[in-house]
Amino acid sequence: MKVHKITTKNFLSLRDCTIDGIDEHLNFFVGPNGSGKTSLFRALKVLKEAFEAAGSGTRKSLDYLYSVHASPRQIDIDVKVSWDTDQERRALCAFLYASLSTTSSLNESIKRLPHLSAYQITPEKSALFDDWLREQCTPEKLQFLFTGQIHLTYREDVGTRLSYTFACKGEQVSLLMAAYPPQDGTFWKEPVPASPTPWRSSRDILLEYLLSSKDASEKDPEQFIDETDTEEDVVKARADQYFAYPAGEKPGSLDMESFLLDLAEKHGYLEVGQVSEAQTYLPEYILLKEMSGINFSQPNSGRLSCSKLFALLLRNACVFTKSVFTPFEEPVPFDEGRVFPVNKVLNDENDIPYWLLGIRDGDVAEKQQYRRIQDSFRLLVGEERTFDLSVRTITQYAQTGTLQEVRTIDILVTDASGNTISMASQGTGLWEALVLSVFLDDSKGRVILLDEPAASLHPNMQHRLVEVLSGAAGQILVVTHSAHLLPTRADRLQHVYRFQREADGTRIYSGGPFLLAELQKVENKFASSIDVASLLFTNGVLLVEGATEAGAFPIWIPLTAKGNGQSLADMNIALHDVGGKENFPFYLRFLKAFGIPYAAIGDGDAISPYYIDRNGNTQRNRNFSALWKVLQELCPKIVMPQETEPFVVLKKQAARAGFYTYDTPDPIAFEGIPEVEAFLQGLPQPKKKADTFYEARYLAESITMPPLAKKVLNQTIGRLRPFPHRKGSARKKGV
């Protein structure tokens, strides 16, 4: 399975969010704490669990998941997917085939058709029909079924409604599930009414479609039509086309799209119930039994509903890892049923010791997979550490007080020196490395959702994890607070999604056109310093022109009224040195693209058309137009200034776009603040400026905060105060 688009409405903080164009390989979800990143994974998990509940016939309340702003009180989760593995496609085809081909049900259905009440479908006739129908229910003929939207709607008064919607000949068709009425697995054409009630067996509709359709007479073979034939003769001849055709004269192909549209028009439903013992040996029933554990020949074994099928598909396709990895405290008891299961799909990290033993002692392909996981673990952990399994028998006391022998499975980790220690005695980092190695190797055709995978990994292991993630075969969705995990290539940054909490919910941003326009520069910035990637995790960013401001401002900010004793770290605000006024445009566009609240403090000459150089000469500001163009993008209400505009006007206009400078009649730099200038001149060796971060920090600690600095810092921190202190802007739908 692949996920292509996720939409949520009224789910926790994700009130109205859409993430489109999700990469088929690797995606990252970032942002500050409380922005809703984990809520996205929770929405996907709720969707999966809703199908599991529906498949088992239970109802699950979701009232506690409403957004606080939800009106009306309705939760919607919509995920566009494609079923791209051979197993998934064969399962969908097998379910459709099995639902339409039950011999006893066909016998009952055909008797309800006009002129066929006496028609008997013998086992031989059933075999002929099944053989033909099997050729219609193949992946090649059902390609249109493999891309669609899985949807959950929840309302307190009606409960959960689930559906899968796909396109048939340009029309939207939905499979309705988890609601009664109608029957689970009912086809319906969009739009679906609030309370659909009528439904019919799809087998009835199939036979009607084949034998009683309006244009059936046009399809009748000439050899079955005679002037003396009665209508009953013609209808029986049509039935014989499908149930008693001579060898080599199979009926023509069924237009599956047209047939499913007919099912949607007549509200046919799909379900696999009890069948004869002979039918259970057909490959379709074998596959469905392996997936579901249902023995279809046993009367009390249960039925395979549509919601149950989708629950199984989602269970096999989606792997949710925990944000906290805890190794076993002791070797696990041997369990042959868990070591050698019929269905070897791994979903739970608690099954890893059993699953690893099963593939270690499995066939050739499984042994190769075991060695790949060992190699991946060695790469991720480094230091030439590897693991292997040990099965041994130990003697321990039972609850009755008697001694008993117990077989156990232990995971042993060996380092470069040859020292071997049980995984039960290792830290969480090594266990997490093994869990990730296992799930990522087994990721082909699956969606692996990693919640904070860097939580227990030191930076070097995080960097190596990036290599492992890039080489994984499946689709990976990563929620992280670690800048070490983010890609440095600009093209891969296209699939970094940043969550920003606003007054009425979460908005989601991606770099989009900015990344394409600044491809080379973005990559250079991300590759040269992790500080740039770290900006994505903040509540806001204060941009400054150079190291002088970067050294002094963190000392003064807690002393301002808006700082109120809090440091930048307390507010999760990053102060970033852009490295010169010419770099302001790039960083402002970057922050805007990812929805990061920003403010900037620059020297007065950054917004002026001219400046005075160190020699006292007037020079033209080559970055004047570039900066003002960006400020106008950030605040369309401001007007592009003329070079003749007085500085007081420029200063006021720039502040509307979040760019601030010192409140003086003429432009000054940081060193032009009177108190700063006096301190520098009063040093044993007078200076015109503080040249380093250290000197600026020493300066800030040595003098009282100047009024000019206090005013500009109050302006910027007032703009950046994190939610809920900062007024939320009108939220628009992202990405």
Region spans (language model):
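Switch/communication elements of ASCE P-loop NTPase nucleotide-binding domains
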Residues: 1-59, 370-376, 397-535, 550-552, ...
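Short polybasic amphipathic segments
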Residues: 6, 75-79, 153-167, 178, ...
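Short, solvent-exposed loop/turn segments at secondary-structure junctions
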Residues: 11-13, 24, 35, 84, ...
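Acidic, Mg2+-coordinating catalytic modules of nucleic-acid enzymes
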Residues: 23, 90, 131-134, 156-161, ...
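Hydrophobic/aromatic beta-strand patches that form the interior of the parallel beta-sheet core
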Residues: 29, 286, 324-326, 477, ...
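Conserved P-loop NTP-binding catalytic core
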Residues: 42-149, 153-160, 221-239, 245-251
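Short glycine-/polar-rich loops that comprise or flank the Walker A/P-loop
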Residues: 73-75, 320-322, 445, 474, ...
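Extended helical coiled-coil dimerization/tether regions that scaffold
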Residues: 212-214, 219-223, 227-238, 244-264, ...
